[in-house]
Regions:
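C-terminal cap/loop subdomain of S1 sulfatases and analogous C-terminal strand-loop tails that border
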Residues: 8-10, 21-24, 29-98, 102, ...
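Phosphate-coordinating loops and pocket residues in cytosolic domains that bind phosphorylated ligands
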Residues: 114
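The feature captures the short pre-catalytic strand/loop hairpin that immediately precedes
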Residues: 1-9
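Intrinsically disordered, low-complexity polar regions and short flexible loop motifs
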Residues: 105
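Glycine-rich "substrate-gating" loop/helix at the edge of Rossmann-like oxidoreductase active sites
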Residues: 13-18
């Protein structure tokens, strides 16, 4: 939620996905300062002003737990989310990866990773996950 009466109309609700990492670049942009390269987020200002339709098509999610509980510790994962799909790759568990078709299954109840009809999507999501990991490492 951002309130800026001099630059953003009240009630704006962009449909694009915003991330917490976008907050600092947005505030810097609104203050008239360009964010540095150390920021992985992007300014939401164009979306809030209604001037940009070009936006990220995917984003990276990573989770690593502590070592208190061995089973939970082994559940670290890296994931990529697009508008229609979520691909999850577990760090320490083999053959446990997941793919969800969010358009058909918004509650993520059916893992379609082994469904042959999704083989091309799995490959694309794996490539996109690696691209995002390379971009943020």
């Amino acid at each position: 939620m951002i309130r800026y009466p001099n630059g953003i109309k009240a009630g704006i609700r962009p449909s694009q996905k915003a991330l917490s990492i976008d907050l600092a670049p947005t505030l810097l942009d609104l203050a008239g300062t360009a964010p540095g390269n150390e920021f992985h987020g992007v300014s939401l200002r164009p979306l809030l002003e209604g001037t940009s339709a070009d936006w990220r098509s995917s984003f990276l999610v990573e989770y690593y737990s502590d070592t208190v509980f061995e089973r939970i510790f082994k559940m670290g994962y890296k994931a990529v989310r697009t508008e229609n799909y979520k691909y999850i790759q577990y760090v320490n568990l083999e053959n446990m990866n997941e793919l969800y078709d969010l358009a058909a299954d918004p509650y993520e109840l059916r893992n379609v990773i082994r469904d042959s009809g999704y083989a091309d999507i799995v490959t694309k999501m794996q490539i996109e996950l690696q691209r995002l990991l390379d971009a943020t490492s």
